[in-house]
UniProtKB/Swiss-Prot annotation:
Transmembrane segments: none
Name of the protein: Elongation factor P
Family matches, as PANTHER family: ELONGATION FACTOR P (PTHR30053), ELONGATION FACTOR P (EF-P) FAMILY PROTEIN (PTHR30053:SF12)
Domain of life: Bacteria
Swiss-Prot/TrEMBL GO biological process terms: peptide biosynthetic process
Pathway involvement of the protein, from the record: Protein biosynthesis; polypeptide chain elongation
InterPro entries tied to this protein: Elong-fact-P_C (IPR015365), NA-bd_OB-fold (IPR012340), Rib_uL2_dom2 (IPR014722), Transl_elong_fac_P/YeiP (IPR020599), Transl_elong_KOW-like (IPR013185), Transl_elong_P/YeiP_cen (IPR001059), Transl_elongation_fac_P (IPR011768), Translation_prot_SH3-like_sf (IPR008991)
Swiss-Prot/TrEMBL keywords: Cytoplasm, Elongation factor, Protein biosynthesis
Length: 189
């Protein structure tokens, strides 16, 4: 298994600490006035979603996790688990709603997503960074709405709620950034 030294660490890298796979979500190289440089990182567990802070000094090493990404089709949610299918082998995998986490609010039936496997066990889901979803409910526009705050809440077809500009109407399809949970633009449909 490959290992990473302090200089290899960067945001987005996947590492393993004490047998648990993590993703680096924040990276900071610190060079104090006195003493050796070190790296401070925030890591998010793929298993339980907890965020931890770790410090690495020169010479410290961490392992690369045994992770595999597989593109699969999201089929449905049975109330406890989300069901996914490998479109080439037709093998189905169930992942608990807790393990799917925040990704669930951006997933539509039939959507292709990346399912993450650790040592052969499905542990999480990564949706595309940008998805197109239909607005099913939002407040109507009134004359003078452009004064002050120029955003209104909108419920999307997955149940997620995002803030959208007043000129966007119910029934329109919009592009949403799934990382920040924000409206990007109207979709070209």
């Amino acid at each position: 298994m490959a290992s990473y030294s302090m200089g290899d660490l960067k945001k987005g890298l996947k590492i393993e600490i004490d047998g648990i796979p993590f993703k680096i979500v924040e990276y900071q190289h610190v060079k104090p006035g006195k003493g050796p440089a070190f790296v401070r990182i925030k890591i998010k567990s793929f298993i339980d979603g907890k965020v931890l802070e770790k410090t690495f000094h020169a010479g410290d090493k961490c392992e690369a996790p045994n992770l595999e990404d597989k593109t699969m089709q999201y089929l449905y949610d049975d109330g406890e688990n989300c069901q996914f299918m490998d479109t080439q082998t037709y093998e189905q995998v169930a992942i608990s709603d807790d393990d799917v986490g925040e990704a669930k609010k951006w997933m539509l039936d039939g959507m292709m997503v990346d399912v993450l496997f650790h040592n052969g066990k499905a542990i999480g889901v990564e949706v595309p960074q940008v998805v197109e979803l239909k607005i099913i409910e939002t407040a109507p526009n009134f004359k003078g709405d452009t004064q002050g705050s120029n955003k209104k809440p909108a419920t999307l077809e997955t149940g997620a709620v995002v803030q959208i500009p007043f000129h966007v109407l119910e029934g329109e399809v919009i592009r949403v950034d799934t990382v920040r949970g924000e409206y990007i633009e109207r979709a070209n449909k």
